[in-house]
Each structure stands twice: as structure tokens, then as C-alpha cells.
Amino acid sequence: MLRTMFHAKIHRATVTQADLHYVGSVTVDQDLLDAADILPGELVSIVDVTNGARLETYTIAGERGSGVLGINGAAAHLVHPGDIVILIAYGQMDDDEARHFQPKVVHVDADNRIVELGIDPADGLLDGLSRPPLSREWNEAQAEL
């Protein structure tokens, strides 16, 4: 049996643009996609922390280092510039892999710059709180990419 498991998330990113007339998808800074191990074209769920909307779409690589997170197409009715969102990707794994897999958690600041990489799906890094024990400092994790 294959299990569908959380494999990556970009946590609390800020939507930088929305284009209702684009054909669809979400445009994400290539640096964020790389850090989360999410491929262009990969299915992602978007959870809008600001208004509670949830949707599924696919990713398009945005300009590296730009901080872009653009909502495209009909989803622009639900998610707006300035909204805080979580992008979640899932993967199918056999039972053994699912029990031992460590996902990638990418924490970003208000400008969508990476501030922390982690492996704990329950990480909820918020300003002013200490780092969760399973997360790693950015420089240490970056060296492994």
C-alpha cells in the first residue's frame, strides 16, 4: 500500500501578487522551491492563514531570490496580496519509507526570505518564540543542499 504523506511545506509565506487572468498555478521563488524540495509543476495545497481558504494547484518557478509568491488564475478570488499562506506538498511512499521519512519545513520572514529550515511537521515558528528542538539553523541546513 502507498501512503500519501506530507513531504514539504513553506510556512507562513506572504503573498506578493495575484493575477486573476493568468491561466492558473502559484509562482514561487526558486530558492524556496529548492529549499523545500518542491518541483515546478508539483501539486501543492495552499492554506490561507489570513482568511481560512484552502485550495490545490501546481507550482511555477519564480525568479530566484525575488521572494515572489504569486497566486494565479481563479485562486486570486480566494487569496490576496499580503495574505499569509502555507504551501504544503505531499508524496506517495510505501509504509516503511513513510515511517522513517523526514519532511522539509521552510520558515520564511515577511519578505519570503528563508530564516530557518526544519524537519518537524508540527513546527510553527512564530516571532518571539524559541526555535523548536528539531529545527536547524539556516547555515547548517543550507550546507546540505
Swiss-Prot record:
One of its GO terms (biological process) is pantothenate biosynthetic process. Its EC number is 4.1.1.11. The modification Pyruvic acid (Ser) is found at S25. Substrate binds at T57, G73, A74, A75. Pathway: Cofactor biosynthesis; (R)-pantothenate biosynthesis; beta-alanine from L-aspartate: step 1/1. It holds the Pfam family Asp_decarbox. One of its GO terms (cellular component) is cytosol. Belongs to the PanD family. This is Aspartate 1-decarboxylase.
